[in-house]
Swiss-Prot record:
One of its GO terms (biological process) is nucleolar large rRNA transcription by RNA polymerase I. Belongs to the RRN7/TAF1B family. It comes from the Eukaryota. Pfam families: Rrn7_cyclin_C, Rrn7_cyclin_N, Zn_ribbon_RRN7. It comes from Gallus gallus (Chicken). This is TATA box-binding protein-associated factor RNA polymerase I subunit B. The lineage of its organism: Eukaryota, Metazoa, Chordata, Craniata, Vertebrata.
Length: 582
């Protein structure tokens, strides 16, 4: 830019007190002496279209920083945007599609800001606006509105609101007084907590995971919600103390910690329900179809969970038959359609686990009696089948012992890790430069004392976080101890009938005769461990450990599948007796 354009601006620089201004290509005033870039509104008189019409532009500039060392002025939604950015980058590092952050999650977030009246919206006349630029990142948040397009519905037109090309945020409550942010480091922290206390879809840390899962589901990524939450707990995805990665000038204290500090494990049901509500709130269209070659299809997920549960590969044929029989593999059933209240939303991982449980009930009954008889029968068959043609017969009793031993060890390890988890931030929080060195010295002293006491007590130092894996349990067919059951045969519990292999077991017990009203009870079925056989509870416990959810969630899905499978028998209308005419 020409020096003459900046010549009319004679204010002294706040940093060096010099009057030596220039203009960048973006129209921002900067000090040539100390290179400080400031916010500046300049009026340009244009006579090309309308005579004497004035056009105002607000340059991005540097954030206003208080004379004290309190840091930048920032809004709560900026903090959540940074968290989402960190989570998206972590997911990309785990192998998720690179388009997730820029082309999907970014647009979901923009849509949410517009729908919640936090940005990209018309502002009331006379409202004082403090434009705050978004932190520079590789998310292309500062790109022109024409460049972000997930679908046509996500492109925000000019009629939809005043779209700020610099993605500046402004509080929807208007001018935020200095007294508003006394109890928080952010500008609108106290206002956010007070205003959003009764709002159903207010932004929260669990909702960041709902955003991530919604983006994963849109892209049909091979990652279930249970996988996502497990990666969060293992530390591969920022969630606990995510605010420690905020820029140093974004000070957090008071109510900010109440918003961004997490001291509880993410709950599957909460994250999933918020995702469904969020998709409807954003008016998203029908998600991409879940077809039979998609990872989230029950046929594919059943194969994964059969391997992880150390069950025979032949069970996959039975799970596929059950999926086809109950029509739960249909595209319309599996695909999420936001806002459609007539269709039940699918939890893909829970559905696949429930399918396996129903198949085990069909074959082994799981009544604490019949499965052991079948196991003894298979053991006799293995003695007679010494050559091992077609693989050894599957013995439920042997499988139970192997899995129970492994499950008890892994469950104990998980419980200990959760009990020892320190809900503290690795990066100490300080709100004054004067106190920074004092706090750092105190933290270093505490850590040194912990190391010394640990050595004296002989406690084992916690191992680093495990490498990310889609499998919690792995079983090798090359093991010589016979602990892998993948190649075992089901012939010991099957019989040939009319040229087809059918189960020897012809009985079945239902978990419930009638499903509850979900709107009234909150659940379709209820589960109490003492009301069901121990074998059934053991299988539920196994899959609840693999998915990190409550056994009641899988039990509820089992009840739904059973009612689909035995629908005709359960709701068969009695025939009316014909009265004989005289």
């Amino acid at each position: 830019m020409d020096e003459e354009d900046a010549g009319d601006f004679n204010e002294r620089c706040a940093q060096c007190s010099e009057v030596n201004w220039g203009l960048t290509d973006g129209g921002r005033f900067y000090c040539r002496t100390c290179h400080n870039v400031i916010e500046r509104t300049r009026e340009v008189v244009s006579t090309d279209v309308i005579p004497n019409a004035r056009v105002q532009t607000i340059s991005k500039g540097s954030r206003s920083q208080k004379k004290t060392d309190e840091g930048w002025e920032w809004y709560v939604c900026e903090g959540f945007q940074l968290v989402l950015k960190q989570q998206a980058e972590a997911l990309e590092a785990l192998g998720v599609c690179p388009q997730m952050k820029d082309e999907v999650l970014c647009n979901f977030w923009r849509r949410y800001l517009q729908k919640s009246q936090q940005a990209y919206c018309n502002r009331p006349a006379g409202e004082t606006i403090k434009a705050l630029s978004v932190c520079d990142s590789s998310t292309d948040m500062d790109s022109e509105p024409e460049q972000h397009s997930l679908l046509h519905f996500l492109s925000v037109s000019e009629s939809d609101g005043d779209l700020q090309t610099d993605c500046s945020y402004a509080s929807s409550a208007g001018k935020v007084s200095e007294s508003t942010s006394v109890c928080s480091g952010s500008v609108d922290g106290s206002l956010y907590v007070r205003k959003n206390r009764k709002e159903k879809l207010r932004m929260s840390m669990p909702m960041t995971l709902s955003f991530c899962y919604m983006a994963l589901l849109w892209l049909k990524e091979p990652m279930t919600l249970s996988d996502l939450l497990r990666f969060v707990v293992e530390g591969h995805i920022p969630y606990f103390n995510a605010y420690q990665h905020f820029p140093e000038k974004m000070k957090l204290y008071g109510l900010d910690l109440r918003i961004f500090c997490v001291e509880s494990w993410p709950v599957y049901e909460e994250v999933y329900n918020k995702m469904v509500e969020l998709a409807a709130f954003l008016d998203l269209p029908r998600f991409p179809d879940i077809t039979d070659n998609c990872f989230l299809h029950p046929d594919v997920l059943c194969m994964k969970y059969l391997m992880e549960a150390n069950l025979p590969d032949e069970l996959h044929n039975w799970t596929c038959r059950l999926v086809k029989k109950t029509s739960i593999g249909e595209v319309d059933f599996l695909t999420l359609t936001p806002g459609n209240k007539s269709t039940r939303k699918v939890k893909y991982d829970v559905l696949a686990a429930a399918v396996i449980v129903v198949v085990l009930k069909l074959l082994f009954l799981l009544d604490d009696h019949y499965e052991w008889l079948l196991s003894d029968f298979s053991a006799e068959g293995n003695k007679n089948n010494k050559e091992g043609e077609g693989g050894p017969y599957f013995e439920f009793k042997k499988w139970y012992r192997v899995i129970k031993c492994t499950l008890d060890v892994e469950q104990k390890k998980l419980d200990e890790e959760k009990a020892k988890y320190l809900w503290k931030c690795e990066k100490p929080l300080f709100y004054s430069v004067k106190k920074k060195s004092k706090i750092l010295r105190r933290r270093q002293m505490v850590e040194n004392l912990q190391i010394q006491f640990g050595k004296l007590s002989g406690s084992v130092q916690p191992a680093g976080r495990p490498n990310p894996s889609s499998f919690l349990l792995s079983w090798s067919e090359e093991s010589t101890d016979g602990s892998c059951f993948h190649g075992h045969s089901l012939k010991g519990i099957l019989q040939e009938k009319h040229g087809l292999l059918t189960a020897i077991n012809t009985d079945y017990w239902l978990c419930t005769d009638k499903l509850c009203n979900e709107k009234l009870c909150g659940h379709l079925a209820h589960y109490r461990e003492e009301d069901f056989p121990k074998s059934y509870h053991f299988v539920l416990r196994l899959f609840s450990f693999l998915l990190r959810i409550q056994p009641s969630s899988i039990h509820e899905e089992v009840c739904v599948i059973e009612h689909k499978l035995f629908n005709k028998k359960l709701y068969k209308k009695p025939k009316r007796k014909r009265s004989l005419r005289k």
